[in-house]
């Protein structure tokens, strides 16, 4: 599985990218190697948001989580997927 990470109003540091890759990397065994997971991290005044979209043969698997901390949002998105 390939993971593409982008950000809106966010400086994507190595620590944040590594955390996303680590958490979503655990899901690789459930998807084909050519599957591309798209991750968008964004910040609003009151929340830090992660959106994960994974296309499948039958549609999409999608998770969106918003908390006051990116790392908590990443954990929740992993659990949702």
Regions found by a protein language model. Name each.
Residues 1-81:
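N-terminal, polar/charged subdomain of small-to-medium soluble alpha/beta proteins
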């Amino acid at each position: 599985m390939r993971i593409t990470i982008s950000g809106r109003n966010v400086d994507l540091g190595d620590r944040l990218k590594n955390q996303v890759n680590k958490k979503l990397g655990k899901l690789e065994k459930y998807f084909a190697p050519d599957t591309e997971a798209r991750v968008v991290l964004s910040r609003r005044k009151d929340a830090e948001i992660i959106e994960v979209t994974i296309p499948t043969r039958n549609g999409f698997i999608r998770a969106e989580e918003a908390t006051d901390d990116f790392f908590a949002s990443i954990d929740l998105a992993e659990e949702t997927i």
